[in-house]
Amino acid sequence: MNFDNKNKNDNYQESIQRIVNQRNNLLKEIENKINQQFGNGNYETLIKSIELIYEIEEKIKRIKELNSLQCDLLEYINPTNSMVPTSPFSSPNFPNSNIEIIDQKQHHQQKLQQQQQQQQQQQQQQQQQQQQQQQQQQQQKQQQKQQQQQLQQSHTKQSPKKQGHNSKQQFLTSLEKHKDQKEENEENEENEENEENEENEENKEKDVEVAKSNKPKRGRPSKPKPEYCFRYGTRSCPYWRKNVIKGELVDVCNACGLHLMKKEKKDLMEKQKNSIKNLLNNDEIITNYDDLGFVLYN
């Protein structure tokens, strides 16, 4: 276990050394860039060279990142005796410089302070708005009171007879309005109750119909009824079924047992038509009709 911890610490030390080397290289590059511009004491070129300023800012950002990494590694190795690195610009490689690097923790604290200040400002603004609203409400109340006082003064100026007469009329009109409003409310309530009752009844009927339609049917399903029995010309034998006779699908009456081929069916229908025509032409009294109006014949 001790051997493993030693290897880990060695690895962390190597990574810290690499970070320090990278930081020193960046500082040397910045120093060389500045020496190129300030070698002859030409300070105006530095102000004009925006690209150089951007390059230096990017390298300073990278140095800040390396500082934060170094802090994290040192705290991880020695959480109790963690050493925060000093500003890299205070090294002998970069003397006489006023540039300072702000630690990330300080930057975070500054952000928190800014947020708190913003919240306080918002709260103050809300309080001011509430105060303004309260003032407006008070002003409105005062105006209403003044209007009421003016109305009362105008009524007191009238004669006592007129005042009494007007007060009676106002009382009667208010009673009539109250009665009318009460009647309207009662009518509206009755109409609403009637509508609700009608809707409930309709819903009940619909529910009953749905229940009937969904109710499972017992026994065999009923066969479709034919138009009429070809023997009697009525619905006295309504239960027909299909059956194959002599290799042909024919209609068979379950009641009388009559089965008809296609040709026989046509012949019977023609006979029925002719018999009905003959009866009508002979002006005979026709008394035997079934529910569908077909003539009963022998």
From Swiss-Prot:
- GO MF annotations in UniProt: sequence-specific DNA binding; zinc ion binding
Q: Where is the composition biased (Basic residues)?
A: 214-223
Question: Which Gene3D superfamilies did the record assign?
Answer: Erythroid Transcription Factor GATA-1, subunit A
User: From the record, what ranges are coiled-coil?
Assistant: 4-37
Acidic residues: bias regions? 183-202
Task: Extract the InterPro entries matched here.
Answer: Znf_GATA, Znf_NHR/GATA
Please give the residue ranges the record annotates as the region Disordered. 148-227
Zn finger spans (GATA-type): 229-256
Q: Does the keyword Transcription regulation apply?
A: no
Gene Ontology biological-process entries: regulation of DNA-templated transcription
The UniProt regions of compositional bias labelled Basic and acidic residues, in chain numbering, are 203-212
Q: Which UniProt keywords apply?
A: Coiled coil, Metal-binding, Zinc, Zinc-finger
Protein name, per record: Putative GATA zinc finger domain-containing protein 25
Query: Lineage, please?
Result: Eukaryota, Amoebozoa, Evosea, Eumycetozoa, Dictyostelia
